């Protein structure tokens, strides 16, 4: 058997137990990678790697379209979205499609169109993927030099980085244009319980936008996750889109500086590790955003946040007992603190009881009842509207807690079955995926650094310890 590693090889070698397996000429002997190492076999075949990536994009878009149509087919307009296990329709609704005042779905046709467009796109991508994987040129450098590359070519790599940044910037501006010119987006803070509106008065002040980045991530500060009005969100996308596009142009026009050439590892596996690290960070940020933020992820579609459901429970029983004659301003609870209302250490009037720990919740159904010093007793006695009562009762019974087949021991409706909040699903999945991507980053970064340093050459199969051990059978 040939020695499956060589000192010349820039990439570490993975091997399969059966060295005879060949796939369309891309076998283990010629590439040093077994079939299960997937795209590693294509490291130096830019045409085939393009096919793999386009086919992968096709699978992603197909999943989006198919799942979109599945959710449309199962959607019941009379029930809230968050009761129906939906994760795609809430995103479309947040963009202002198909919904009216209060987040009520008035037209499902835009959702159907979205699904069909994604399916058609996936067919085009799928064809392109199969073409480039099976029929197209193995390498692009000769026929299409613009699309060809060598992994060690630092200038070409930063050009590719620049193109990616420009595409990301265009994506950010698509949201801006939707909010400004194409019907607007759903604003959970619109008076009377939320509505679709065009965002006209963008926040473009750098001190406000970048102030979010300088906030503490803890408690009442909440870093960028604390954003609570759409003007700031859309204005932030203007800044982000501009920075991405300008940065992309800069990376296309310039070559890496000497310090960057020295500090970074310039190989395919290194770029993979950088990408995995970035996606990991995105996953963790998305987890926090969907869990805590009810502006970017309106509760009408995703269900209440944890603090929101807790405060809604306190509010619901305050309303009930006030109707029954309780003096909610002075009633004492079992600890001697206020039963319904109390003061925070800094003097604001907040809800009493266990929900005191969520005193800094902001929610559209609650804010109208606040005064300059927290909750306003006179407003709580005179100004509570029916829609606020309905919404808080609904949120109280739909806390984002989570076991798969129960409702976690909080106040529930008599017929609440198998409710799991989309917030729970989205936050948990993004946390877990963010963690896995981080582990992938560590793995590939370690291999890339070892390969660059020249000391990872795979295992010498002639003297591998397992060869001298008794077979399992």
Swiss-Prot record:
GO terms for molecular function: chlorophyll binding; electron transporter, transferring electrons within the cyclic electron transport pathway of photosynthesis activity; metal ion binding. Keywords: Acetylation, Chlorophyll, Chloroplast, Chromophore, Manganese, Membrane, Metal-binding, Phosphoprotein, Photosynthesis, Photosystem II, Plastid, Thylakoid, Transmembrane, Transmembrane helix. The modification Phosphothreonine is found at residue 15. The modification N-acetylthreonine is found at residue 15. GO terms for biological process: photosynthetic electron transport in photosystem II. Disulfide bonds: none annotated. [CaMn4O5] cluster binds at residue 367. It comes from the Eukaryota. GO terms for cellular component: chloroplast thylakoid membrane; photosystem II. Gene3D superfamilies: photosystem ii from thermosynechococcus elongatus. Binds multiple chlorophylls and provides some of the ligands for the Ca-4Mn-5O cluster of the oxygen-evolving complex. It may also provide a ligand for a Cl- that is required for oxygen evolution. PSII binds additional chlorophylls, carotenoids and specific lipids. Residues 1-14 form a propeptide. Its main location: plastid. Pfam families: PSII. It is a multi-pass membrane protein. This is Photosystem II CP43 reaction center protein. It comes from Guizotia abyssinica. The gene is psbC.
